[in-house]
A protein has these predicted regions:
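Non-heme Fe(II)/2-oxoglutarate
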Residues: 1-82, 88-89, 102
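Catalytic core of non-heme Fe(II) oxygenases with the double-stranded beta-helix
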Residues: 79-175, 180-184, 190-191
Length: 192
């Protein structure tokens, strides 16, 4: 069985549960549902991934997620950095829309700025269905040295936490276990 970790040298977690409440997460899920129902999602990506930059939306709720992500990045790096690009999207999936997980491995190292020195990615679990049987395996699977190597691990999902890792790290969604929707907020930041 693939191991499950909370943190390690690749992945760090930052707790914002005192700032971002479960009610905030539910409000964010409602906004994402509306975006999806309006058809604003990619058809060539896993179902359903929003097209727009969620961090650019004007609802006040996104300020909490945006600023907590930025702070998490600074903490991961141990310093402030000049940000050249920051974006976020949401991913909503369930058993009815589940795809072949072998096809879902990816990384986010696609710099938009030629001066980019680094990129970090983050995941926030907006909602994990309450009927999931094995929560440890419904989060995110990481392959730190590539998908063909044996050092893969799952990151245990925690409510109210950002999970931060290098943007070039291969990863894929965890095992879908429910007909109810799992919602995540994913984010990338490029820095100089």
């Amino acid at each position: 069985m693939i191991p499950v970790v909370d943190e390690n040298t690749v992945v760090k977690k930052y707790n914002f549960s005192s700032l971002i409440t479960k009610q905030d997460d539910l409000e964010a899920c409602g906004i994402v549902k509306n975006i999806i129902s309006d058809g604003n999602y990619f058809t060539n990506s896993p179902k359903f991934q929003t097209k727009e930059n969620i961090f650019a939306r004007q609802e006040a709720i996104w300020l909490k997620y945006r600023m907590s992500f930025l702070f998490s990045v600074f903490m991961y790096l141990g310093r402030e950095v000049k940000v050249s690009n920051m974006m976020a999207w949401s991913f909503m999936t369930n058993l009815q829309g589940a795809e072949d997980r072998e096809k879902l491995w990816h990384h986010h190292w696609h710099p938009q700025d030629s001066n980019t020195k680094g990129m970090l990615s983050g995941i926030w679990y907006l909602n994990i269905p309450d009927d999931v049987k094995d929560r440890d395996y419904c989060g995110t699977e990481i392959a730190p040295t590539g998908v063909n190597n044996d050092d893969k691990f799952f990151v245990r999902p925690n409510d109210g936490h950002w999970i931060i890792y290098p943007g070039q790290t291969w990863h894929r969604p965890g095992i879908v276990q429910s007909s109810k929707y799992r919602f995540i907020l994913a984010a990338d930041i490029e820095y100089q």
